[in-house]
């Protein structure tokens, strides 16, 4: 993309990480538990879904996003099970790009398609409380820059949303500053869950979906903007064109 993306918003259990089936070598000198994941029954079923549905590079992105989210929160003194629900952050991070899978590919833009799939997945597993709303909101918003930085958003919305979106943003473009993650932590994460093409590979899926179904890339959305930048010859309504077509004659 030609314009810079905000690094902050660009879009705890035992060692389940060892069973994560993500491709990579064991991380050297990792602190016990720092590369672990929640091991609740819901976390395990979510991991199974992601393992089956997401390509390895996308699955690794999802797993790294959680690890970065938890580590960045820890750098701020925010502790799991005390200041936030780690399972809920895990659900958001693992499911946030399900709209880029075959299973989640609908007529909706990928963020909303993924949010809908995540909500249905939780409901099908008997989860019908506020967690469904929190997961849906976080996934649907995860490419909307700066929203979770609003002081009112941070005060009124669940902490898990901002924590998860911070981790996703870190994995997309890197930490905002050297102190956002513990020293050497990113290297240990990447040793176990390598990037495998990283976010450029993710972008290729987004573009392919948009080319196959332009309804998934409406103008002035992230998918629409990326499609326009990659394929400028394709029709792309500007804001003035949309206004010119309005039925009120303004």
Model-derived regions, located:
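N-terminal secretory signal peptides and thylakoid transit peptides that target proteins
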Residues: 1-17
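Divalent metal-dependent phosphate-bond-processing catalytic cores, especially two-metal-ion Mg2+/Mn2+ enzymes
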Residues: 15-19, 53-59, 63, 67-82, ...
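C-terminal region of N-terminal signal peptides and the immediate post-cleavage residues
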Residues: 21-32
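Acidic/His-rich, divalent-metal-binding segments that scaffold phosphate/diphosphate chemistry
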Residues: 31-99
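Short, conserved micro-motifs enriched in small and acidic residues
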Residues: 56-60, 104-112
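Acidic/histidine metal-binding catalytic segments
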Residues: 85, 126-138
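His-Asp-centered metal-binding catalytic motifs of divalent-metal-dependent phosphohydrolases/nucleases
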Residues: 85-103, 114, 138-145
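An active-site-proximal "capping" alpha-helix that borders the catalytic cofactor pocket
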Residues: 109-124
């Amino acid at each position: 993309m030609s314009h810079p993306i905000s690094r902050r918003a660009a879009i705890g259990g035992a060692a389940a990480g060892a069973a994560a089936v993500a491709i990579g070598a064991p991380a050297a000198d990792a602190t016990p538990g720092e590369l672990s994941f929640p091991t609740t029954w819901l976390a395990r079923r979510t991991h199974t879904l992601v393992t089956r549905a997401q390509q390895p590079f996308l699955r690794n992105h999802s797993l790294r996003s959680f690890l970065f989210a938890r580590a960045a929160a820890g750098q701020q003194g925010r502790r799991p099970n005390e200041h936030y629900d780690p399972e809920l952050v895990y659900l958001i991070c693992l499911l946030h790009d399900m709209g880029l899978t075959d299973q989640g590919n609908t007529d909706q833009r990928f963020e909303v398609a993924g949010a809908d799939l995540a909500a249905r997945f939780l409901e099908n597993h008997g989860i019908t409380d506020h967690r469904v709303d929190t997961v849906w909101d976080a996934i649907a918003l995860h490419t909307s820059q700066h929203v979770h930085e609003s002081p009112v958003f941070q005060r009124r919305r669940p902490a898990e949303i901002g924590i998860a979106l911070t981790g996703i943003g870190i994995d997309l473009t890197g930490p905002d500053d050297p102190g956002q993650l513990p020293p050497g932590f990113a290297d240990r994460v990447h040793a176990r869950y390598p990037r495998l093409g990283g976010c450029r590979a993710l972008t290729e899926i987004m573009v392919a979906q948009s080319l196959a179904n332009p309804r998934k890339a409406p103008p002035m959305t992230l998918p629409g903007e990326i499609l326009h930048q990659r394929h400028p010859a394709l029709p792309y309504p500007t804001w003035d064109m949309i206004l010119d077509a309005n039925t009120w004659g303004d």
